[in-house]
Amino acid sequence: MKASADASSPQETTPPLSLLLFVANRPGDEEETAAIQAHIQQLPSNFSFELKVVPIGEQPYLLEEYKLVATPALIKVRPEPRQTLAGRKLLQKVDYWWPRWQREVALGLQADMQKSAAEQSDCSMELSRLKDELFQLRQERDRLAEQLQFKDRIISLLAHELRNPLTAGGIALETLESNLQEESSQQLPIEDIQRLFHHARSQTQTMGQLITDLLLAARGPQDKLQIMARQLDLRQLCQETVEDVRLNFERKKQHFTTDIPLDLPLVYGDGDRIRQVLVNLLDNACKYTPEGGKIHLSAFHRMTQKVQVTVSDTGPGIPIEQQEKIFGETVRLDRDRAIEGYGIGLALCRQIIRMHYGQIWVDSQPGKGSCFHFTLPVYS
């Protein structure tokens, strides 16, 4: 491509080869200037170039700036370095340097392309790095959101669990208080008074454990519930737990029975945690079973070196499609709407039993009650 003596418009790309032709505008110089322009314009060029004619008379300060000693003079401004051709045989000098200038332009464009490619590569790497950082930040955001949700769920869950021992302990203390106001002939036997005191103390200990769990949960999901498993007399634990919740059944005139064999083997577990599971299952059975209904607690030794515990009731039952979902942390069934509580204690039960390498599940039919089962490993 060849350029005229006119300057390129601002919208056009700057030509890689830029030339200035300085002339003195003496009489007769017009023909020489035109001849030089015509000669340069017809030279073969693989690149666009611009040729500007600069009259020295109009801009004399350029003589000093470009250090000109004679005219006409041709200065290569771009590509750098700057080069000046002047004096006699100017056109021959132009013919000599023209191919070299073409090579300079080619090398410069190649270098620019390589630089551009390198810059694009750097930009791609930077973009990739920023994408990685964005991905990590999103992961961190999701992790923090999950921690907050976990904390809210577990605190709500454990706060709900506090209701059970608080209510049971309160009933025991109310009974003791009422007993003090009765006439001596109507007061409870000393054995019942001792049982009520033991019951209140046991519920207080349970609340202390739950408060510890609340403080632990406040630190986030990285601090899981602690299991201190050891040899455990499950039969005795069941009997103690039954005594803790018996008053709840009596208040609703429910028929509560047990079937726990004397030769039930010892299990491997955390007594406080298994007590939580038993209390939760028995409390749910009490809540969902109508007045005068039946609740049964049983345990037996399975052939798979597991002990299975079952809590059955004559409550409304659970639809088959909901029986797995009830162990979720936020699930609440239609039957739960009128019952106080969050309905999320079963999630804690499942977590505890799984940490004992056991299983927990439910068998139920709507209108026919529910049977909650869990297993624990036999101690060996």
From Swiss-Prot:
A GO molecular-function descriptor: ATP binding
> Which domain of life does this protein belong to?
Bacteria
Task: Identify the SMART domains for this entry.
Answer: HATPase_c (SM00387), HisKA (SM00388), KaiB (SM01248)
Q: How is it modified after translation?
A: Autophosphorylates, probably on His-160.
UniProt-annotated stretches for the region KaiB-like domain, interacts with KaiC: 20-101
The EC number(s) attached to this protein equal: 2.7.13.3
Swiss-Prot/TrEMBL GO biological process terms: circadian rhythm
Kindly list the residue ranges recorded as spanning the membrane.
none
Isomerase in keyword set: no
Tell me a GO cellular component: plasma membrane
Residues with the Phosphohistidine modification? 160
For this UniProt record, give its keywords in alphabetical order, as a comma-separated list.
ATP-binding, Biological rhythms, Kinase, Nucleotide-binding, Phosphoprotein, Transferase, Two-component regulatory system
Q: What happens on changing residue 160 to D? A: No autophosphorylation, more protein is hexameric, no change in stability, simulates phosphorylated protein
Could you tell me what reaction this enzyme catalyses?
Answer: ATP + protein L-histidine = ADP + protein N-phospho-L-histidine
Q: Name one Pfam family in it.
A: HATPase_c
* InterPro entries for this protein: HATPase_C_sf, His_kinase_dom, HisK_dim/P_dom, HisK_dim/P_sf, KaiB_domain, Kinase_SasA, Sig_transdc_His_kin-like_C, Thioredoxin-like_sf
Provide the function of this protein.
Member of the two-component regulatory system SasA/RpaA involved in genome-wide circadian gene expression. One of several clock output pathways. Participates in the Kai clock protein complex, the main circadian regulator in cyanobacteria, via its interaction with KaiC. KaiC enhances the autophosphorylation activity of SasA, which then transfers its phosphate group to RpaA to activate it. In addition to its output function, recruits fold-shifted KaiB (KaiB(fs)) to KaiC to cooperatively form the KaiB(6):KaiC(6) complex (independent of SasA kinase activity).
What is the UniProt domain comment for this protein? The N-terminus (residues 1-108) interacts with KaiC, while the C-terminus (109-380) autophosphorylates and is probably responsible for self-association. The N-terminal domain stimulates the C-terminus to autophosphorylate; KaiC does not stimulate autophosphorylation of the C-terminal domain.
Entries under NCBIfam families matching the protein: PRK09303.1
Oligomeric form and interacting partners = Homotrimer with a small amount of possible homohexamer; a protein fragment of 109-380 is also a homotrimer. Interacts with KaiC, probably as 1 SasA trimer:1 KaiC homohexamer; unphosphorylated SasA has the highest affinity. Homodimer. Binds to the B-loop in the CI domain of KaiC; SasA and KaiB(fs) compete to bind to the CI domain. Binds preferentially to doubly phosphorylated KaiC.
Question: What is the protein name for this chain?
Answer: Adaptive-response sensory kinase SasA
Q: Which organism is it from?
A: Thermosynechococcus vestitus (strain NIES-2133 / IAM M-273 / BP-1)
